[in-house]
């Protein structure tokens, strides 16, 4: 997570932003400079671009039986394959706890049929999303949320939401309902060994207020807003015990009606973060926290489309699979005493970074939302050979596997190795969008239908549409050849010059139109068949990013006839008449991001805080840190090469394409050297 956010930074630091919202929406602003170099002269334009994001969404969240993960428990109580060493536990009861031999033998008989299932991801996600929702409350930005309307003069789109934003809540409250819900049966526990087979939580370092917070996060979660992270969740256990020195009664008194809502409010975000920090640190749940943070970030937001077709992306909600809760860490007081076993180096690094700057989760979510949509769109584009050297043998099966779906999109977009979620059978996916030609019908109000594929007052969209500009992750190695996504490219001569224009291949035509739009020109064109309804390349005024047009996915269209280059009313840089052989010059184009800030409403502007990679040095004393050579498959990454997308165990950086198609070959030669060592 941290390394993904800092991937393009030259000084090993990154801009981080705290969660913010204006009725479920916020805007990211970038300051951009584009240089045009030709005839040994350099002209430039400095301009602002913006991208809206929405926190609104309604993911389908499933809680299924998952795998047990005992990482973090003391090494001497685990077997070589990561299971619990029961004999060592029983010996510890005899030697250290002073339990008589016959009592230990009786206990050993009782536990023969017990489950030793341990998975805290569901609880950690509840705690983490409660923290973010409470931050919105404290900023005066908590609301039900709404999706902004789209109106371009041709069509109008207003997608419905479940809860009216004007009638929704204005502050975060306990997500359970004491008047209708049944709550888990919980009890305080401090004995040396358990007597019944239920989850046992170890919350010994937490204050009473923090323990109450954990207990309430174990309860049912009702969806009270339209925000994606405010998803419905069942109570995590029917009954459980918590290991603590005191019996905590505040939550029980509130449930029984002995305390009012005002007397038992959710704690501040600072207290929530403190509880999360203590719970993860004491239970050594670094690996599981990594998984929880990944899942929450992957569903937290989506870009608000700047074109009508892009609204098809907002009509699809994620399918999320989360493992059911279980905990054995509190069953014995000594399980967490000693060196923590099998902690993954990346998880430990991200944990330290998030505790130093919780804004990392929100910033990462912004970047993932852009890369996910862009990667899914580029998957379809690349199948035609646009901007890459792939053919029909190209392997993209990683998109079809739920556990690698998101990572496949990230790798397809950025060229980086995209780390998996760190746990098997835990994922975010979009099952309706697995096929290239999936059709989405967007309900619209038609004003002027020219240029749109409209059937019965619905805009018909094939495949995953591009919904945003890439400036939040810019530059990225989206293709194997130089192009606008990578920040540097050259406008080359046309394939053929005619009296009324010039003929380009599809990639070169897009590069030409992109540069001309930034300079202040419109590019008009024709293509074979002329069935797509487009006559010029489109770019939204808010970001000036010329999208790859839909016709590139048409196998019958091989070339683009640029018929005219027209100066816009707002013109910025004088360029040669590039579609004429008499005036053509080779133009080098380079783009740089200077500054980024986010805005939620007219007066809420948030500038970046920064975190330095050299500052994030996780304490590994008493922790067995494992490196890439010892990872299980679910700690690998999805890698993009010229042969396709595949899962690998090592991580290496993306290679930004230059004038030659080097990305695929270079990927197979460059390997990031793992600097993590095994700490015994």
Swiss-Prot record:
The keyword Acetylation applies. It is found in: Virion. Acetylation is necessary for viral assembly. The modification N-acetylmethionine is found at residue 1. GO terms for cellular component: viral capsid. Pfam families: LA-virus_coat (PF09220). Its main location: virion. Capsid protein self-assembles to form an icosahedral capsid with a T=2 symmetry, 40 nm in diameter, and consisting of 60 capsid proteins asymmetric dimers. The capsid encapsulates the genomic dsRNA and the polymerase and remains intact following cell entry to protect the dsRNA from degradation and to prevent unfavorable antiviral responses in the host cell during all the replication cycle of the virus. Nascent transcripts are transcribed within the structural confines of the virion and are extruded into the cytoplasm. Binds and removes 5' cap structures from cellular mRNA. Forms a covalent bond with m7GMP through His-154 of the capsid protein while releasing the mRNA body. Belongs to the totivirus major capsid protein family. This is Major capsid protein. The gene is gag.
């Amino acid at each position: 997570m941290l390394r993904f956010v800092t991937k393009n930074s030259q000084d090993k630091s990154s801009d981080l932003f705290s969660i913010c919202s204006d009725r479920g929406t916020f805007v990211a602003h970038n300051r951009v400079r584009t240089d045009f170099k030709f005839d040994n002269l350099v002209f430039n334009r400095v301009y602002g671009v913006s991208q809206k994001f929405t926190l609104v969404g309604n993911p389908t969240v499933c809680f299924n039986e998952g795998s047990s993960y005992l990482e973090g428990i003391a090494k001497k109580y685990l077997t070589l394959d990561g299971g619990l060493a029961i004999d060592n536990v029983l010996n510890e009861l005899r030697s250290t706890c002073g339990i008589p031999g016959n009592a230990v033998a009786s206990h050993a008989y009782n536990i023969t049929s017990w489950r030793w299932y341990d998975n805290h991801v569901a609880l950690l996600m509840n705690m983490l999303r409660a923290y973010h929702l409470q931050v919105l409350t404290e900023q005066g930005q908590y609301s039900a949320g709404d999706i902004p309307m789209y109106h371009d003069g041709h069509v109008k789109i207003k997608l419905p939401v479940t809860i009216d934003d004007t009638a929704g809540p204005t502050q975060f409250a306990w997500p359970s309902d004491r008047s209708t819900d049944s709550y888990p049966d919980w009890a305080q526990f401090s004995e040396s060994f358990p007597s019944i087979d239920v989850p046992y939580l170890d919350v010994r370092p937490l204050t009473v207020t923090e323990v109450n917070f954990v207990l309430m996060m174990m309860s049912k979660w009702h969806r009270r807003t339209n925000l994606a992270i405010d998803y419905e969740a069942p109570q995590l256990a029917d009954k459980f015990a918590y290991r603590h020195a005191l019996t905590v009664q505040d939550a029980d008194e509130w449930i029984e009606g002995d305390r009012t809502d005002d007397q038992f409010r959710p704690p501040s975000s600072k207290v929530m973060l403190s509880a999360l920090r203590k719970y993860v640190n004491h239970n050594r749940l670094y690996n599981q926290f990594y998984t929880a943070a990944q899942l929450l970030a992957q569903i937290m937001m989506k870009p608000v489309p700047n074109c009508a077709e892009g609204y098809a992306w907002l009509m699809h909600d994620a399918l999320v699979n989360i493992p059911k809760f279980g905990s054995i860490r509190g069953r014995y007081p000594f399980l967490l005493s000693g060196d923590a076993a099998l902690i993954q180096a990346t998880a430990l690094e991200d944990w330290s970074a998030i505790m130093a700057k919780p804004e990392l989760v929100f910033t990462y979510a912004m970047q993932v939302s852009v890369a996910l949509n862009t990667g899914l769109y580029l998957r379809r584009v690349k199948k035609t050979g646009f901007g890459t050297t792939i053919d029909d043998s190209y392997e993209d099966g990683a998109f079809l596997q739920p556990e690698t779906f998101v990572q496949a999109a990230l790798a397809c977009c950025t060229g980086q190795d995209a780390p998996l979620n760190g746990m098997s059978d835990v994922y975010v996916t979009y099952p309706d969008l697995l096929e290239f030609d999936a059709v989405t019908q967007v309900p619209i109000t038609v004003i002027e239908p020219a240029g749109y594929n409209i059937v019965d007052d619905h805009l018909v969209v094939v495949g995953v549409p591009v919904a945003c500009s890439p400036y939040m992750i810019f530059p990225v190695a989206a293709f194997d050849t130089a192009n606008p996504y990578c920040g540097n490219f050259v406008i080359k001569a046309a394939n053929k010059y005619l009296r009324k224009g010039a003929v380009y291949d599809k990639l070169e035509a897009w590069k030409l139109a992109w540069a001309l739009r930034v300079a202040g020109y419109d590019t008009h064109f024709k293509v074979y068949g002329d069935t797509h309804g487009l006559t010029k390349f489109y770019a939204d005024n808010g970001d000036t990013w010329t999208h790859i047009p839909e016709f590139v996915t048409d196998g019958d269209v091989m070339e683009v006839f640029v018929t005219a280059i027209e100066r816009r009313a707002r013109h910025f840089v004088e360029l040669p008449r590039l579609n004429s052989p008499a005036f053509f010059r080779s133009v080098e184009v380079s783009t740089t991001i200077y500054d980024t800030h986010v805005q939620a409403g007219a007066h809420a502007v948030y500038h970046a805080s920064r975190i330095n990679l050299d500052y994030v040095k996780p304490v590994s004393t008493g922790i067995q840190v494992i490196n890439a050579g010892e990872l299980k498959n679910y700690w690998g990454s999805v890698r993009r090469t010229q042969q396709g997308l595949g899962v690998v165990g090592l991580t290496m950086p993306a290679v930004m394409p230059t004038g030659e198609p080097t990305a695929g070959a270079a990927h197979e030669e460059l390997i990031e050297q793992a600097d993590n060592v095994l700490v015994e």
